[in-house]
């Protein structure tokens, strides 16, 4: 299921807060984990992983900054912690795959 979303916040390289927009002016805020990828953690004592996690977060923020109005999230169910899982598209480009292809995340 595709939904138009506004990106509210990038938490790390594979998690974003979004505002889902539904008909009749209904809007819902949710924390979404990007489906099928895993980025290094930003909250860790491992300094190398933290550095890579910060780079992944910055790259995701950069990819989303210019295209907030054209974001589509394809919902893939809920993850093991109850968060929605989704593929994020900006102007038709799959952001999940961009992060993997650039080495900021790995397939999961």
Whereabouts are the PLM-identified features?
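Small beta-barrel nucleic-acid-binding modules, primarily SNase/OB-fold domains
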Residues: 1-108
């Amino acid at each position: 299921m595709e939904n138009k979303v506004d990106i509210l916040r990038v938490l790390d390289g594979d998690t974003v807060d979004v505002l889902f927009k539904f008909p009749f002016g209904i809007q819902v805020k949710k924390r979404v984990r990007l489906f099928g990828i895993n980025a290094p953690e930003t909250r860790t004592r491992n300094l190398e992983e933290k550095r890579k996690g910060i780079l992944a977060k910055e790259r995701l923020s950069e990819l989303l900054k210019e295209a907030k109005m054209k974001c589509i999230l394809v919902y893939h169910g809920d993850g093991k912690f109850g968060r929605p899982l989704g593929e994020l598209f900006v102007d038709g480009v799959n952001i999940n795959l961009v992060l993997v292809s650039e080495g900021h995340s790995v397939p999961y």
